[in-house]
UniProtKB/Swiss-Prot annotation:
It comes from Streptococcus pyogenes serotype M1. It is found in: Cytoplasm. Residues 14-91 form the GIY-YIG domain. Signal peptide: none annotated. This is UvrABC system protein C. GO terms for cellular component: cytoplasm; excinuclease repair complex. NCBIfam families: uvrC (TIGR00194). Residues 196-231 form the UVR domain.
Length: 598
């Protein structure tokens, strides 16, 4: 805890409000609300926490707070601040999570369409449906039963669907408002589960067609009846009152929360929404924050009723969700909340089971790799790769895997300092010596296994540095790629030989991940360095353009091409004088002409 935080903690009020934790860049990384700001904010910096909260606290270098009149006001403010700042440690709802609806347009000649966007007073909406496939299947069925207009053709033209009996040509069929009102009422009854009359009508038409020996038409009516029956069976009846409602349940364990929402429409469960996320403060408060964000998303239909668990404050929910909030006390409705809660518990347990299974698989892979190489279990693996283009901007990178997982805080980047031209062996020698001479000198944690990207030559160079130059006893292995640039062989031993490794084994998958990761990290770093070098060389020797202004241009425009495309005004907007801007543009033009001249 730094001195600034210590001083601010002493000044915190005993009031409700919101607090905003910031990192060293001044970026808001977490927004929370509290009934008592002093108690809540101080709790982050006192006592012990679980791992994820410790990670959050380790990044906090400053905080701000906003005092509110009430807990309700604090909740509303918190939701708005999260939506505005999108802090990385706050609950994040699934991106672009919207559900399809069926819509009857309010045009003079209505159409039946599928949409994910609800607009007020823009038609009748039915749904939501769990996915596009389900919505399309229902629409196809409705299209075959109800002859809505299918296209935007002028009303004096007959479309293709008219000939299929699925569209009412408006110059031929009824055009009076009463006809369309009856048709819309039929669709509403059908989608509300009152389809007995429609089935009876279809059955009568099927029998009549059979008597007339029109068996193809009779088969069509039979298929329609079958389609309605199938749609019925796919929707589980959850209540007899045919009410539209959302049912919330949540469960917390091991610092994680799972929220389940059942979407019940006309008494039938049509879909559920599942979200799992870590929580850092109070479970009930994080649940309220989730609900606020959930319904702030305009694509989430707000039903007539929302059921919430017993532990949640009804008044706070009512302040953020504009509908009837119910906390069921007994009977079927309470059982529905219990069912949502049970499903939340099951989903959370599944997550933990999968994590445990993954840990066991990874642990087994590390154990097996150690046995295969006849070394101690390689709990910590450090892997290296070089990257350059014909010797220009040469760099290297090191990635670290601990217990089979990337430890990104331990990753390191190296600019090659002593090697001229494209020499992978010399570059590898320099980087390994720099890394492990420091490990030896400073007593840093040494790996159980070093992996270099390359064949026999790279491995021999690495062993020479580690064993002969530095006198260390760290096992060294090499990973060779095939002609498709894919992980192929593991080299190890004295003398070096290919270690037999089944391609479908967990050990092979682990090594493949390590090689891909170190390659990605090295190439990304090389691109950054090359871009910066290209940027700097082009902008060298321009009067008035020092290192700070170069860095400003690099951060804003990224490339010389982007600067060349920018207007003088755009560059001046960064605080660079007009005369310097003109010099920059002239330099870029001169360089371009030099490259194009023979």
């Amino acid at each position: 805890m730094n001195e600034l935080i210590k001083h601010k903690l002493e000044l915190l009020p005993d009031s409700p409000g919101c607090y905003l934790h910031k990192d060293k860049e001044g970026t808001i990384i977490y927004v929370g609300k509290a009934k008592n700001l002093k108690k809540r904010v101080r709790s982050y910096f006192r006592g012990s926490h679980d791992t994820k909260t410790e990670l959050l606290v380790s990044e906090i270098v400053d905080f701000e707070y906003i005092v509110t009149e009430s807990d309700t006001e604090a909740l509303l403010l918190e939701i708005n601040l999260i939506q505005k700042n999108m802090p990385k440690y706050n609950i994040k709802l699934k991106d672009d999570k919207s559900y399809p609806f069926l819509k009857i347009t309010n045009e003079s000649f209505p159409r039946l369409v599928i949409t994910r966007y609800i607009k007020k007073n823009d038609g009748l909406y039915f749904g939501p449906y769990p996915d596009s496939y389900t919505a399309n299947e229902v629409k196809k069925l409705l299209d075959r039963i109800f002859p809505f207009k299918k296209c935007k053709n002028p009303i004096n033209k007959v479309c293709f669907y008219y000939h299929l009996g699925q569209c009412c040509a408006h110059t031929i069929c009824h055009t009076d408002k009463a006809y369309w009102d009856r048709l819309i009422d039929d669709v509403k009854h059908f989608l509300n589960g009152k389809d007995d009359k429609i089935i009876e009508d279809l059955r009568s038409k099927m029998l009549a067609a059979s008597k007339e020996m029109a068996f193809e038409r009779a088969a069509e009516y039979r298929d329609l009846i079958s389609g309605i029956a199938t749609m019925r069976t796919k929707q589980r009846v959850m209540s007899k009152d045919l009410q539209d409602r959302d049912i919330f349940g949540y469960y917390v364990d091991k610092g994680w929360m799972c929220v389940q929402v059942f979407f019940v429409r006309q008494g039938k469960l049509i879909q559920r929404d599942v979200n799992l996320f870590p929580y850092y403060t109070d479970a009930e408060e994080d649940f309220l924050t989730y609900m606020g964000q959930f319904y702030q998303d305009k694509q989430h239909f707000i039903p007539k009723e929302v059921f919430i668990p017993e532990a949640i404050d009804e008044e706070l929910v009512a302040a953020i969700v504009p509908t009837k909030i119910i906390k069921p006390k007994r009977g079927e409705k309470k059982q529905l909340v219990a069912l949502a809660t049970k499903n939340a518990r099951v989903s959370l347990q599944q997550k933990f089971d999968l994590l445990e299974k993954d840990i066991k698989k990874t642990s087994g892979a590390i154990e097996n790799l150690g046995q295969l190489l006849r070394i101690d279990k390689p709990v910590r693996i450090e892997a290296f790769d070089n990257s350059n283009i014909q010797g220009t901007s040469p760099v290297a990178a090191m990635v670290v895997f601990v217990d089979g997982k990337p430890s990104k805080k331990d990753y390191r980047k190296f600019k090659i300092k002593t090697v001229v031209g494209p020499d992978d062996y010399a570059s590898m020698r320099e980087v390994l010596f720099r890394r492990y001479s420091r490990v030896k000198k400073e007593g840093l944690q040494a790996p159980n296994l070093i992996i270099v990207d390359g064949g026999v030559g790279q491995v021999n160079v690495a062993k020479d540095v580690i064993e002969k130059q530095l006198g260390l006893t760290i096992p060294v292995a090499g990973l060779q790629k095939n002609d498709k640039h894919q992980t192929h062989d593991l080299l190890f031993g004295n003398p070096l030989e290919v270690v037999p490794l089944p391609r479908r084994s967990e050990e092979f998958f682990l090594l493949h991940r390590i090689q891909d990761e170190v390659h990605r990290f090295a190439v990304t770093f090389h691109r950054q360095v090359r871009r910066k070098n290209s940027f700097s060389s082009t902008l060298d020797h321009i009067s008035g353009l020092g290192p700070k202004r170069k860095q400003l241009l690099l951060r804003h425009f990224k490339t010389i091409t982007a600067i060349a495309s920018a207007t003088s005004e755009e560059i001046q907007a960064l605080g660079i004088p007009k005369t310097v801007v003109e010099a920059i543009q002239q330099q870029i033009t001169d360089n371009k002409n030099d490259r194009s001249s023979p």
